[in-house]
Amino acid sequence: EVDMRCKSSKECLVKCKQATGRPNGKCMNRKCKCYPR
């Protein structure tokens, strides 16, 4: 999980790619969830 606020899952794709190296993630409860870990 990335502690970043989001409005859409598209915002998380960039953040997840930075965090995990893969642009896989969803915006849930206004926070980004990245997977797989």
From Swiss-Prot:
Disulfide bond is among the record's keywords: yes
Main location: secreted
Disulfide cysteine pairs (residue numbers): 6-27, 12-32, 16-34
Family indicated by similarity: Belongs to the short scorpion toxin superfamily. Potassium channel inhibitor family. Alpha-KTx 01 subfamily.
Effect noted on mutating residue 24 to F: 100-fold increase of affinity towards Kv1.1 channels, 5-fold increase in affinity towards Kv1.3 channels and no change in affinity towards Kv1.2 channels
Function of the molecule: Reversibly blocks voltage-gated potassium channels (Kv1.1/KCNA1 (Kd=79 uM), Kv1.2/KCNA2 (Kd=547 nM) and Kv1.3/KCNA3 (Kd=492 nM)).
GO (cellular component) term, any one: extracellular region
InterPro entries: Scorpion_toxin-like_sf (IPR036574), Scorpion_toxinS_K_inh (IPR001947)
Site (Basic residue of the functional dyad): 26
Subcellular location: Secreted
Listed Pfam families: Toxin_2
Entry comment, domain topic: Has the structural arrangement of an alpha-helix connected to antiparallel beta-sheets by disulfide bonds (CS-alpha/beta).
Keywords: Disulfide bond, Ion channel impairing toxin, Neurotoxin, Potassium channel impairing toxin, Secreted, Toxin, Voltage-gated potassium channel impairing toxin
UniProt miscellaneous comment: Negative results: does not inhibit ERG1/Kv11.1/KCNH2 potassium channels.
Free-text tissue specificity from the UniProt record: Expressed by the venom gland.
Record-annotated site: Aromatic residue of the functional dyad: 35
A single GO molecular function term of this UniProt record: potassium channel regulator activity
Protein name: Potassium channel toxin alpha-KTx 1.10
